[in-house]
Amino acid sequence: MDRYELYLELARVHHQDPLTWHGTNLRDHHIDAINQLIQKHRIESILDYGCGKALHHPPEWRATLYDPAVPKYSTPPQGQYDLVICTDVLEHIPEEHIDRIVAQLKQYSKGWLYVSVCCRLAKDKLTMPNSMKRYNAHVTVKPQAWWRQRIQGERVILKFTD
């Protein structure tokens, strides 16, 4: 199993716990900015890539939800969207797969790309069932400049959280 598959499986296990990963990062840090973007640019179609449990999405967004670690949302999206949202996701992906995932995000976007990345180790430690080995939830921890080099474009909004 390569590191991408390992972290995907760790995320699947973690998402099964109803007490973890509620998507509060989106709710607490990004909804207002995203709503302003939607209104200002008359955005009609939205993809949340890495939506997690999708507990805090405003219903008026009518977003397409995708998360390969959540069975309910694991069907890959089709087409392009006016806005692609990807918050608190990329730091959970091994470095050797970042460029591929960013390319996917850009392919799904026919308009705006809103990305938020955390640049520090996570408080969460992930484990596989029946294993003592613990993995930090943030596998790719890089400075902001590193992320800026990989995620850039005319209609890209890149935010950082601590």
Question: Model features per residue range: what roles?
Answer:
Residues 1-81, 99-102, 108, 119, ...:
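Conserved N-terminal segment of class I S-adenosyl-L-methionine
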Residues 85:
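A conserved beta-strand element that flanks and buttresses the S-adenosyl-L-methionine
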Residues 89-92:
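Hydrophobic adenine-recognition pocket in adenosine-nucleotide-binding enzymes
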Residues 111-114:
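Short glycine-centered segments of the SAM/dcSAM-binding site in methyltransferase folds
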